[in-house]
Amino acid sequence: MHWQTHTVFNQPVPLNNSNLYLSDGALCEAVIREGAGWDSDLLASIGQQLGTAESLELGRLANAFPPELLRYDPQGQRLDDVRFHPAWHLLMQGLCANRVHNLAWEEDARQGTFVARAARFMLHAQVEAGTLCPVTMTFA
């Protein structure tokens, strides 16, 4: 049974099902101003996908279940393995699919590619920030 004890009035509505790119006017303007306007359609598509309730839930799960160090198996044999929640892997796959790890280093890179990559990075950061560390190290 659920008891109604009070009315919550000081919290924003959940950010479910919004376009994280198109709802950020400053980011849209900066992308165009800094020479990556050619990527606006793809950024809008990425922003729509990342703004879904499902994507935001993946971010929550990745943070609720941090990586787990497995030093030994049940028989005492050394493992030295790290187990990640499936949400972490799905978020990493999205980062790679959106080329956040290598966009500016592609052979077909053009003016504004670093800006486009930074915008994609910012969109993913709104969902979950921990996955951005290995992607940044790969990009460096």
Task: State each model region's role.
Residues 1-110:
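Extended, charge-enriched "interface" segments that sit outside catalytic cores
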